[in-house]
């Protein structure tokens, strides 16, 4: 799934793919289905997505990902 119907912002396949990869990697890290589904809630604008960024050691590029969330989730 590359496009989430809950996202009402600009459709950008590259951004969706990048955000989706964070949730996929986070799921692979913890192997808990709830992590995968919760990470995608509210078009990635949630605390689990932020925690996944931290857990995947993406702290230095958090702003880039949050900007992507804002673009697709308006």
Curated annotation (Swiss-Prot):
Keywords assigned = Amidation, Disulfide bond, Hormone, Neuropeptide, Pyrrolidone carboxylic acid, Secreted
Q: Does the entry annotate any disulfide bonds, and if so which pairs?
A: 7-43, 23-39, 26-52
In this UniProt entry, the residues modified to Pyrrolidone carboxylic acid are 1
Which InterPro entries does the record cross-reference, listed alphabetically? Answer: Crust_neurhormone_CS, Crust_neurohorm, Crust_neurohorm_sf, Hyperglycemic, Hyperglycemic1
The reply on keyword Disulfide bond is yes
Instruction: Look up the record and give one Gene Ontology term from the biological process aspect.
Output: neuropeptide signaling pathway
Classify the source by domain of life.
Answer: Eukaryota
> Which one of the record's GO molecular function terms can you name?
neuropeptide hormone activity
One of the Pfam families matching this protein, by short name? Crust_neurohorm
**Residue positions, PTM Valine amide:** 72
Annotated Gene Ontology cellular components are: extracellular region
The subcellular location is: Secreted
Cited function: Inhibits Y-organs where molting hormone (ecdysteroid) is secreted. A molting cycle is initiated when MIH secretion diminishes or stops.
Q: Which family does it belong to?
A: Belongs to the arthropod CHH/MIH/GIH/VIH hormone family.
The protein depicted here goes by the name Molt-inhibiting hormone
């Amino acid at each position: 799934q590359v496009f989430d119907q809950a996202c009402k912002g600009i459709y950008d396949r590259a951004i969706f793919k990048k955000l989706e990869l964070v949730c996929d990697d986070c799921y692979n890290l913890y192997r808990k289905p709830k992590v995968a589904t919760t990470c995608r809630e509210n078009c990635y604008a949630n605390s689990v997505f932020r925690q996944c960024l931290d857990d995947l050691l993406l702290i230095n590029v958090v702003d880039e990902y949050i900007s992507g969330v804002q673009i697709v989730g308006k």
